[in-house]
Curated annotation (Swiss-Prot):
Residues noted as binding ATP in the record, renumbered to the chain: 544-551
Protein name: Replicase polyprotein
Pfam families xrefs: Peptidase_C3G (PF12381), RdRP_1 (PF00680), RNA_helicase (PF00910)
Annotated RdRp catalytic domain residues: 1638-1772
Catalysed conversion reaction: RNA(n) + a ribonucleoside 5'-triphosphate = RNA(n+1) + diphosphate
Length: 1906
């Protein structure tokens, strides 16, 4: 059995792509495509079945596997034993001869097990799709299918050892050789096949214009060159094969072309007559060449000459109006643009660019080459090599096909479209087929009308409709039939109007329509005529969660209900004609024609308010009523006659609760609903999906399961319905199937129709009965004689005379008579004399005759039927009308056939098409431009600002306003002078007239500036007709109802700015410039698509068109020496420069090579040029560094790469780099990227490119702002080509001129235009030596599209814009000049390696005076060794020293990256220790009340401290006279739960669910404490940070249970939190530290805050989530909360900055988090020490898992004590631990700093200190004591806090000092207790309340040991 292992052919790969597809995907192809595939891949249908179905044989099943479900660990642990891993060997042996042998063994050794039926299971052998196809190709599947014994065929294929003793590889050898099985999957195979196919096809693509570029990154390509050299020999065989193919291909091509010419010449004369197409093509090409080669000034004249020459030659008999041609020759000044040279540039970006230039000369040359080959059998090429030959053949093939396609398209365009338009609109013609269909439908309709009314039309043509109406009104379905008939008549009427038929053709229709309308008016209950109450429609409301398939259920339900209203199957199939989809955003009911069903999808999505009501609610009330409802139509002729007549209204929405604010009685909306149903899905048809809005997994309809289970692409089976009362919300029926729900809908629909019909009957009867009700009052009056005489006529009876018409006799045709006789009906026919004869009697007489005799007699019979004269009248009308119509059709068709237009159109087709391409017709037909009004956002007169009125803009409500909009304009002009007051700042009028403007402007001169708002947007101003268009003013407001500025785009100039500030330099009387440019003056115009939350949602606003370019009418020109757009500068300095990093490659020797720039756009996700990915390998390490010296070094393999693609899935020259959380989070920039609306706003603009460049002079990176005043956007693809780096496609981007250089790629392109709100247009990707540069356009949607591929926990958002003041004036950064962080003044950064954010509007108050003071015994006990720390800035050597900045610098350190593998291994080991002893009572999220007040679940879940600071911003609202949080939670006693804090907590939690950080500002505060005198003199004051109380409460809710668990299991879990040093906890600690022997060390970390490693810290949230195990939603919340700890934002003075790694001391998890770092770090250090020692000495290497066998630790924060065994003490001791910690970035030192500078490798327990206490064993009481250091004890009495009474404070400290002395030896207690007592007695004259040595010991025993 020979298998093919060489690379597969392209044909095989192409067919394999389809063979390996799903069955349903295969059948989605067209019929022709499927036949071609089957022909290429299969022999017959039997083989197709074989390739797509499992092969069942005796004893086993052969099947195809899609994807291996095993994980990587199962692949690594491979066991080479038959029984355990034979299956893997079978799979690995594909395409090997041993495969059948292994299959046989696998079946033999397969363990026999029984299924649930007790039958033995059959082994399944899986093969890959490619090997399955190979088995099919070799005939194995066919043999297997027909074999009787599978053992025989397998032995035959594998080769019997006796008959074929050749060497066979053993199973174990194969298994060892292939020890890890390759994973295969459908996706991988399809991708590889598609890549191969794309590569082959790509070689045949048209050659684009190539721009040679140099990538602006610095890369090395030596390795790539070597690879190319080593693989070049592989192309030899390919070239040989190609030569042989070409030898066969060229003769075949020539033969094909010869056949084409022969065939074409035969049909040419028949198609084109005497005209030669070859001559036409040659003339056209000659004409174009003449024009192309003409001088620029003569191009138009040359074109005119060639056009006249062609017209004279081919169409000389046609008269042509040449006025435009004369105008062309006289005034044309613009020639065809033929000046499009190829540009040779040097790309300055790291990607090549491709540009397609459609130049006329290139087009003409291509056509000439193609035609020369096709018609003249010439093949022009130069000997450019075999590769060029192949490419040329591909070009010629496509060119030939392109000529054919062009001919087809042009002819179709002329004959099918242009002729049709000309005939219809000019000649009044119509296509024959369409006319036939129209006439046939018209005839059928006339027959129906005649059957209805024909027998009731009298001889005068009057219709007696009363009896007809009486019969119809008895049947509801008959009423519906009449209504459908009437609708059909309206449709025919519209067709007649569209066809513009002559009057003679419409007489018959109008006659029938008149009678039908008369009947329909009488029976109408739909309300179409508005003459009576209409049929009340049934209102069905479907609601349910998103993804339930409500819209999918709407269509079947609408069709079922529509079918109930129809009786014609054809009408039912054309269901879309009777279903109308209503969109309330469209103001008009366009195309509404009385459809039976109206659907309102996504009902109630628009927000409803009294000021901006949602029209859906009022519309529903109107449509669901019985009163006639005229609809708002766009066309005037439709307004008067279009009324709502639908029978069913179906609404769908996501929620049941609708917030209705615009109705005075909101229940009126719900009362209109007849059936309200919640749509759900059956479980078997659903799947679980992640909902970002809900922040959790939700159940949604799985369309794949629906198709799989039901077999249909759509079904109603998955739906179940719960019925809900729409008013009360009560559920009254549940679990209804669709059919049950449909029955209720049908019943309700029928009931509504019956009730409406009965109501009309009642009203008519009621009107008749009450006719004389008004005259009853006359009965009380006396009657006169004359009245009595008149009453004598009361006996006269009023009757309706029934006019009897004479019926006419109509002869029955023989065929009709035979049909009547065969049916043997009871009908009566008449002889000529009028004698009645029954059909049954005729049938009886003819029954005995044979068929031929019967037919002969029937043909001789003459019988008649009586027909009403009205019926005959209508028949004659119809006959005459049809006759006229047929004659008219014949005339029209003959006219078209005989008209020479067909011949002319073939000639003109090609000419018109080419002239269209070059834009000739657009120029020729252009006339004078329509005079449109000048569009402006505003008009500024200097004192008055005129704005258009918008309901969304209600800012004026906050000003003193005068609203005159509801007054008539003449009344406004009459009273405005008297109504205007000095306090009025805003005036609202219906229209601005010259008088009103003059009056308001005069008033403004004496008061202040006034905003004039007009409802009418058109006005005349200074002789110009102006239209005011709405600008996006609310883009600058957080809430449209307020004037609070929205700093999203850093705008500082709002309406307040206009009112309060005075104008500066003005160059024109119309314009005023505010002090910054981001005001409402230069806002972009409202666009059609409303995306932003503050954009208008009304239909009128949405309908406005967006201009393609920024219009300059609203630009304010001023004389200021500053940036054109201050907003752009602030965006760059405040945001872009903090997020912009230089990406560098780290060499093996540690040197760095700068590559390019990267911009963090969200969290730790960076946007970079796409070509970066191709030049880095997984073994590389990169370093990123920003302007502020923030540095991160990360392995490239740990960075996730996500391509940025456009809406069509095409990759852009950009990539998102998702860094590990080790890289700090950055502020969100996504909102500053352009959106689709802003992209369409500009074609040319001014831009700035901020770049980072290395300065050799300064030896660091500096920033430079490069400017360009002209940037052009393009939307065609460019290929960026770099000779050394390859090609990259730039699909959409920008081109500009800038002095860019290598390394500038990746810098963001910022638009420096005030009109553009979204400033970032893209990233720079290339440049050339001439200064041309190119940028890839990146929009918000591009980024969001890429974010969908990244886990939500990796894209946590942080937006600090709304919390800071960006309106402060900043120093101007000059362009093209280097600058560093010291040149930026928007933030006073404490140190480099921190990230600046901005400034607060005003700094926070901080006390600068200490609260510590000397006590009464100060200096009388011992020498003073401490003093209060410095709390304010000081002057040293004439310079001011900022104490905070000085002490915060220790946090500004770089930390190393810890590998994921090491971190994960340490985490798993720590988890097993920390999570011991869990209690379910603690594994829950605390409530808001429990987080504040505590609960009884644990003693460690205590109440919050009400005396500590509430944090920012709460500190600003602190109630005077209260301390800390007491103003919100009460001062003492029971806690008060404040509502404002509760709302803040809820908001924080909700944001965290959505992956958004609510800003937490940690306030840096100098700690008021005593420190050693030498440290105070060195200005070392510790800084602590407190956070907002709503964050602390939220953090306690989600973490406090876990922290309580740690405290309950203290010491045994390595954590000392909660340890009581006076209790048995100290004994327990000693036992823990002596577990591994006597050797211990105690150390602490220097600058611990600066060395914190985020790689370790972020795992703390994972550990807490493991403890709670309460779902992904809460897990995400904990990650978001913890990120505010290790990537914290701080306030220092008035400046706000971010730390790259942090641990604010005020967070509730400070100590547990530090303990976690200790436990994780020591395990990593253990492995590092072991590896180093093993490598040096060749000894056994211990792994991290051995840590718990040899080491025992306890830690409290950054303080720890380590006990280790003798076995590891040689390489795991104080010395080696210190060295290993340095690799992790920590500085670990001996706790006692060593004596004489020497640090021992280990100590004993008695020699170390922990928590500033020693370990002393009391031999008398057999316990371990924890004596405090003597220096600390003796220093305590010297100081006290200012809040206490000085004497009381001294006494308390002295007593505490003596109590601490009792834990030392007794002699120490006796000595110093006396000294302290005497000093206090001498100072105060009082005695201390103290106990004896034994007394204190007894007290500790009673309190803590019992």
């Amino acid at each position: 059995m020979n298998f093919t292992k060489q690379p597969a052919s392209l044909k095989y790969l192409s067919s394999m792509k389809l063979i390996t597809s799903q069955d349903q995907d295969f059948f989605n192809f067209g019929e022709v495509s499927r036949e071609f595939i089957l022909e290429q891949a299969y022999v017959n249908g039997y083989d197709f079945h074989m390739l797509h179905q499992d092969m069942n044989c005796i004893g086993f099943v052969l099947s195809i596997f899609d994807e291996d479900a095993r994980d990587e660990y199962e692949y690594k642990d491979l066991n080479c034993e038959y029984h355990e891993n034979l299956f893997d060997a079978v799979v690995d042996s594909e395409f090997d001869k041993i495969w059948p042998h292994l299959v046989l063994k696998y079946i033999t050794y397969y363990p026999c097990s029984l299924n649930w039926r007790g039958m033995p299971t059959i082994p399944i052998v899986y093969v890959s799709k490619h090997f399955w196809y190979e088995l099919y190709r070799t005939g194995f599947l066919n043999k297997l299918y027909h074999c009787g014994s599978w053992t025989d065929i397998l032995l035959l294929l594998s080769g019997d050892v006796e008959t074929n003793p050749g060497p066979v590889e053993t199973y174990k050898d194969l298994c060892r050789r292939k020890n890890i099985r390759k994973r295969k999957s459908r996706i991988r195979e399809e991708i590889k096949m598609q890549q191969h196919i794309d590569k082959i096809i790509g070689q045949e693509n048209e050659e684009y214009k190539i721009i040679n570029v140099n990538m602006q990154g610095i890369f090395s390509f030596n390795e790539e060159k070597e690879i190319i050299k080593s693989t070049a020999w592989k192309f030899n065989s390919t070239l040989d094969k190609t030569n042989s193919i070409i030898d066969n291909l060229i003769p075949q091509l020539e033969e094909t072309l010869a056949g084409f010419r022969k065939t074409y010449s035969k049909c040419e004369s028949k198609i084109f007559g005497t005209i030669s197409v070859v001559d036409v093509c040659v003339d056209l090409i000659s004409a174009l060449l003449q024009v192309s080669f003409a001088k620029p000034a003569m191009k138009i004249a040359s074109l005119a000459v060639e056009v006249f020459r062609l017209i004279k030659k081919y169409v000389s008999n046609i008269n042509i109006n040449i006025d435009k041609i004369k105008e062309l020759l006289s005034y044309g000044k613009v020639a065809l643009n033929n000046n499009n040279p190829i540009i040779h540039v040097t790309m300055q970006s790291n990607s090549p660019i491709l540009e397609v230039l459609l130049q006329p000369n290139i087009i003409v040359s291509a056509i000439f080459i193609a035609l020369s080959v096709v018609f003249h059998k010439k093949f022009t090429y130069k000997k450019l090599g075999i590769e060029a030959m192949i490419k040329r053949l591909g070009d010629l093939g496509r060119a030939a096909k392109g000529c054919s396609d062009l001919n087809v398209v042009l002819n179709q365009a002329i004959t099918n479209h242009m002729l049709e338009h000309f005939g219809k609109n000019v000649l009044g013609l119509k296509q024959e087929d369409e006319l036939k269909v129209l006439v046939e439908g018209y005839r059928n309709w006339c027959d129906e009308v005649r059957d209805l009314v024909g027998h009731k039309i009298n001889s005068d043509g009057e219709l007696d409709s009363k009896s007809i109406v009486e019969n119809i009104m008895k049947d509801v379905y008959e009423i519906q039939r009449i209504e459908n008939m009437y609708k059909k008549g309206l449709e025919i009427s519209r067709n007649i109007a569209e066809l513009k038929l002559p009057t003679k053709l419409t007489i018959s229709f109008n006659t029938h329509m008149r009678y039908l309308t008369e009947v329909f008016k009488s029976v109408d209950t739909s309300g179409a005529f508005g003459n009576k109450p209409r049929t009340q429609p049934i209102v069905i409301w479907l609601f349910g969660e998103s993804g339930r398939g409500k819209s999918g259920m709407t269509w079947p339900l609408a069709i079922d209900l529509n079918n109930s209203l129809l009786d014609n199957v054809d009408e039912m199939r054309n269901f879309s004609k009777n279903i109308y989809m209503r969109n309330v955003e469209q103001e008009f009911w366009d195309n509404y024609q009385g459809q039976n069903i109206v659907c309102x999808d996504d009902f109630g999505q628009m927000r409803d308010s009294s000021s901006n009501p949602n029209p859906e609610f009022m519309e529903l009330i109107r449509t669901a009523n019985i009163a006639p409802y005229p609809l708002h139509m766009a066309h005037l002729e439709d307004k008067r006659k279009t009324k709502f007549t639908s029978k069913v209204i179906i609404m769908t929405s996501n929620v049941f609760e609708q917030d209705v604010n615009s109705l005075t009685f909101p229940d009126a909306f719900r009362r209109r609903v007849d059936l309200c149903a919640e749509v759900k899905n059956k479980d078997e048809f659903t799947k679980m999906c992640w909902s970002k809005s809900a922040g959790k997994m939700v159940q949604r309809l799985d369309k794949g399961k629906v198709k799989k289970i039901t077999g249909d692409i759509h079904s109603t089976v998955p739906y179940i319905v719960d019925l809900i009362d729409p008013e009360s919300g009560e559920v009254y029926k549940t679990g209804l199937e669709y059919e049950e729900f449909l029955d209720m809908c049908l019943e309700k629909t029928s009931q509504c129709r019956d009730d409406s019909a009965k109501l009309n009957d009642f009203l008519m009867d009621y009107a008749e009965k009450r006719a004389n009700r008004s005259r009853e009052i006359d009965e009380v009056c006396a009657r006169t004689m004359d009245e009595a005489f008149v009453d004598a006529y009361d006996d006269v009876i009023d009757v309706n005379m029934q006019i009897e018409t004479v019926d006419e006799m109509e002869l029955i045709e023989p065929n009709k008579l035979r049909e009547m006789i065969e049916q043997c009906s009871n009908k009566i026919v008449y002889t000529y004399e009028g004698i009645a004869v029954k059909i049954t009697s005729l049938a009886f007489k003819l029954a005995t005759l044979n068929y031929e005799e019967q037919w002969e007699q029937i043909k001789e019979m003459k019988y008649y039927v009586k027909v009403s004269s009205g019926v005959n009248y209508l028949k004659r009308v119809l006959s005459q009308g049809m006759k006229v119509c047929e004659e008219w059709m014949k005339e029209m068709i003959n006219y078209v056939k005989e008209h020479p237009w067909m011949t002319v159109s073939l000639i003109l087709g090609t000419l018109i098409g080419i002239l269209t391409v070059v834009g000739f017709w657009k120029w020729l037909c252009s006339g004078d431009k329509k005079k449109n009004p000048i569009k402006r956002h505003f008009i500024n007169t200097g004192n008055v600002l005129i704005l258009p009125d918008r309901e969304l803009n209600t800012f004026w409500k906050n000003q003193e306003s005068l609203d005159l909009r509801d007054m008539y304009i003449n009344r406004v002009e009459e009273h405005i002078i008297s109504l205007l007051k000095l306090q009025h700042k805003v005036v609202l009028v219906p229209k601005v007239t010259k008088y009103i403007l003059t009056t308001v402007e005069n008033h403004a001169k004496i008061s202040d500036k006034i905003i004039l708002i007009t409802r009418n947007r058109y006005l005349n101003y200074q002789g110009k007709f102006v239209e005011l268009i709405c600008g996006e003013i609310n883009q600058f407001f957080i809430d449209p109802e307020t004037l609070d500025t929205n700093v999203e785009a850093f705008a500082s100039a709002d309406l307040k700015t206009f009112v309060q500030r005075k104008p500066i330099v003005i160059e024109g009387p119309e314009f005023v410039e505010a002090q910054t440019s981001g005001d409402q003056i230069t806002l972009r115009k409202q666009t059609q698509k409303v995306i932003e939350a503050f954009a208008s949602s009304d239909a009128i606003t949405m309908a406005r068109k967006t201009p393609k370019f920024v219009e300059s009418d609203d630009v304010v020109e001023v004389s200021m020496q500053m940036w054109k757009d201050q907003v752009a500068q602030k965006l760059i300095t405040n945001r872009v420069l903090t997020n912009l990093y230089k990406i560098c490659l780290v060499k093996e020797n540690g040197d760095m090579v700068p590559l390019l720039n990267g911009l963090f756009v969200r969290s730790n996700i960076m946007l970079a040029p796409g070509h970066l990915v191709g030049f880095l390998s997984d073994s590389d390490t990169i370093e990123i560094r920003n302007l502020f010296d923030v540095v991160f070094r990360v392995p490239w393999k740990d960075v996730k790469k996500v391509d940025v693609v456009n809406a069509f899935g095409e990759s852009k020259e950009a990539v998102l780099l998702c860094f590990p959380k080790f890289v700090c989070q950055h502020t969100d920039l996504v909102k500053h990227f352009q959106d689709s609306e802003s992209m369409s706003k500009f074609k040319r603009c001014e831009v700035t490119l901020p770049v980072l460049r290395y300065s050799d002079k300064m030896n660091r990176f500096l920033a430079t702002l490069i400017e360009c005043d002209k940037v052009e956007a393009y939307d065609r693809p460019y290929t960026l080509n770099d000779s050394s780096k390859g090609q990259y496609i730039l699909r959409q981007g920008l081109e500009y001129t800038m002095p860019t250089t290598n390394g500038d790629c990746g810098a963001p392109l910022v638009i420096n235009e005030t009109q553009v709100i979204r400033k970032i247009a893209g990233i720079h990707v290339a440049g050339d030596a001439r200064g041309k540069a190119y940028a890839e356009s990146i929009s918000q949607k591009d980024l969001i599209r890429a974010f969908s591929k990244i886990d939500v926990s990796m894209q946590i958002q942080l937006d600090l814009d709304q919390t800071l003041n960006f309106n402060q004036q900043q120093x101007i950064i000059p362009p093209n000049a280097e600058f560093g962080p010291e040149d930026l003044d928007f933030c006073d950064l404490p140190s480099l390696k921190m990230i600046p954010v901005g400034r607060l509007s005003e700094p926070l108050f901080e006390p600068g005076k200490t609260d510590i003071r000397p006590s009464l015994v100060y200096g009388k006990i011992s020498e003073i060794k401490t003093k209060p720390a410095i709390l304010r800035n000081v002057i040293v050597d004439g310079k001011i020293v900022n104490i905070k900045h000085k002490n915060l610098k220790k946090c500004a350190m770089d930390t190393p990256y810890v590998s994921k593998e090491m971190t994960e291994e340490a985490f798993q080991l720590v988890k097993s220790v920390w999570l011991k002893g869990m209690r379910n009572e603690l594994k829950k999220v605390l409530t808001y009340e429990e987080a504040i007040c505590g609960n009884d679940s644990s003693e460690f879940i205590s109440a919050i401290n009400r005396s500590s600071s509430p944090g920012f911003p709460w500190i600003r609202d602190r109630i005077k006279g209260t301390k800390g949080k007491q103003g919100w939670f009460g001062a003492e006693g029971e806690y008060i739960l404040d509502e404002d804090v509760f709302e803040a907590v809820k908001t924080r939690i909700q944001n965290a669910k959505n992956g958004v950080r609510t800003p937490v500002m940690w306030v840096d505060t100098l700690k008021d404490e005593r420190r050693p005198i030498e440290k105070v003199d060195q200005l070392k004051t510790r800084v602590f940070s407190n956070g907002p109380m709503d964050f602390s409460i939220t953090f306690r809710m989600y973490y406090l249970g876990f922290i309580a668990h740690l405290m309950e299991n203290r010491i045994t879990n390595e954590v000392s939190i909660g340890t009581n040093v006076y209790s048995q906890d100290w004994n327990k600690t000693v036992r823990k530290l002596k577990t591994m022997g006597p050797k211990v060390i105690a150390g602490d970390f220097s600058t611990f805050d600066g060395s914190l490693n985020v790689c370790i810290m972020e795992k703390f949230a994972d550990l807490a989530n493991e403890f709670y195990d309460d779902g992904s939603e809460n897990a995400l919340i904990r990650h978001v909360l913890l990120m505010d700890v290790y990537n914290s934002t701080h306030i220092c003075g008035d400046s706000v900055y971010m730390m790259t790694h942090s641990q604010p001391s005020g967070n509730p998890a400070t100590t547990p988090l530090n303990c976690f770092i200790n436990s994780m770090g020591l395990r990593m250090v253990f492995e590092l020490c072991s590896k180093k020692y093993s490598a040096l000495n060749g000894t056994k290497c211990y792994v991290m898992k051995d840590f718990s066998k040899h080491v025992s630790i306890v830690s409290y924060g950054d303080d720890n004590v380590i006990n280790f065994s003798d076995e590891v003490s040689e390489w795991f001791n104080m010395e080696t631990i210190t060295e290993a910690f340095e690799k992790l970035g920590f500085t670990y030192t001996d706790e006692l700093k060593g004596k004489n500078g020497e640090v021992p490798k280990w100590r004993t327990i008695e020699d170390v200190q922990y928590l500033k206490r020693k370990f002393r064993y009391d031999s008398k009481r057999k316990v371990w004591e924890a004596p405090l250091c003597m220096d600390t004890i003796l220093e305590m009495p010297n100081w006290c806090r200012g809040s206490l009474d000085i004497q009381e404070g001294t006494k308390v400290n002295c007593e505490n000092a003596i109590m601490e002395l009792s834990m030392h030896e007794e002699y120490v207690f006796d000595k110093w207790s006396k000294v302290i007592s005497k000093a206090y007695q001498k100072a105060t004259g009082d005695c201390l309340d103290i106990s004896t040595y034994n007394g204190y010991a007894q007290e500790r025993f009673l309190n803590y040991y019992l």
